């Protein structure tokens, strides 16, 4: 697997230098699961961040499909900033065999300490995600039932 190519497709790493991407790639562990396997379970503790390298997965909350994850998609971003093992807000289920790059929050935070631009990229992405979620919530509240 070309880890650099996988990371280059991931939104959270946009704008990082090749040297920074190389450091991040070096801190990752590869994880593979079979189709139908739960990668992250809603309500369970989580302290890991993942980037889909190969395959497809879906995000579900209370049985409702919220999103589909293709190569380059990430999940578990909040766990990077909060290492208390907070509960996962949704489940991620492999639709095909999936290979991922994975980091524990501790490993990733050590990388952020070495590469400040990574911390800025993470903060920017999380702010965008919060803004998108807020906009979706506002739209849902305004839509008549």
Question: What is the predicted function of each stretch?
Answer:
Residues 12, 37-96:
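Cyclic nucleotide-binding regulatory domains
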Residues 31-33, 69, 103:
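Hydrophobic residues at beta-strand termini and immediately following loops
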Residues 3, 20-23, 80, 86-90, ...:
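A small-molecule sensor/coupling module
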Residues 1-4, 63:
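Absolute protein N-terminus
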Residues 4, 14-35, 87, 95:
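Short proline/glycine- and basic residue-enriched helix-capping loop/turn segments at helix->loop/beta transitions
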Residues 98-107:
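A short hydrophobic beta-strand segment most commonly corresponding to one strand
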């Amino acid at each position: 697997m070309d880890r650099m190519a996988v990371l280059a497709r991931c939104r959270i790493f946009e704008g990082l230098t090749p040297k920074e991407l190389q450091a991040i790639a070096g801190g990752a562990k590869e994880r593979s699961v079979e189709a139908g396997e739960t990668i992250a379970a809603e309500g369970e503790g989580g302290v890991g961040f993942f980037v889909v390298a190969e395959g497809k997965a879906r995000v579900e909350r209370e049985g409702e499909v919220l999103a589909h994850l293709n190569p380059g998609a990430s999940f578990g971003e909040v766990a990077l900033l909060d290492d208390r093992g907070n509960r996962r807000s949704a489940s991620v289920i492999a639709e095909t065999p999936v290979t991922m790059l994975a980091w524990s929050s501790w490993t990733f935070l050590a990388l952020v300490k070495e590469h400040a631009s990574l911390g800025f990229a993470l903060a920017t992405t999380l702010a965008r995600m919060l803004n998108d979620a807020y906009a979706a919530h506002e739209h849902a509240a305004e839509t008549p039932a």
